[in-house]
Amino acid sequence: RILLQEHSRFLHRYSVSDKGGCGYLMEKYYLAVDIGASSGRHILGHMENGKIELEEIYRFENGMDHKDGKLLWDVNRLFGEILNGMKKCKELGKLPVSMAIDTWAVDYVLLDEKDQILGDTYGYRDHRTDGMDAEVAKILPETELYARTGIQKQIFNTIYQLMAVEKKTPEIMKQAKTLLMLPDYFGFRLTGNKLSEYTNGSTTQL
């Protein structure tokens, strides 16, 4: 569930000037952005005397928004919090050489041909997936699905979320060009690179 990203764009936008002296730091720092369902934090790590030293530099609250009976994630706010923590690195004069973004599993965004998010970004606790397991089973029996993926059936798995999109808002599915899991989406916003990190991708049951 961890997506490693090179930080070239981060350095371009938030680098400290050489006059400040921070450009000559020899210490190598690595940034982990750990986002959970109720909070997120930025952790800087570095090696000191042969040991890994960890430092929490930024923390923020998280949670699903209730809107028109739906449970949704505000991905723009979350991305803003990621940037806030990165700016904190600049304030501390501790620029990471690389970073990773980690969130919960199964939730995703669909992007159109212009890389804009289609529809709402649902949270895994939303009930739109109720009954979608039966719809998937009409196409692929549960035993065969498990044989292919080896993933435990959970009604919030991405496969059932996508079936809900197909059944309830098919126009969104027709416009969709890319699916990105949430950590991969944030990484895309930072780097411009689209990819699917294997371990998080395995939680989709796809």
Can you name each region flagged by the protein language model?
Residues 12, 18-120, 130-131, 147, ...:
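N-terminal glycine/serine-rich phosphate-binding loop of ATP-dependent small-molecule kinases
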Residues 126:
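Carbohydrate-associated surface elements
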Residues 35-37, 50, 145-206:
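Gly/Ser/Thr-rich active-site cleft segment
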Residues 130-141:
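Hinge/lid segment of periplasmic solute-binding proteins
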Residues 84, 88-91, 134-135, 164-168, ...:
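Residue-level signal for well-ordered alpha-helical scaffold segments within enzymatic catalytic domains
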Residues 2-8:
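N-terminal amphipathic/hydrophobic targeting modules at extreme N-termini
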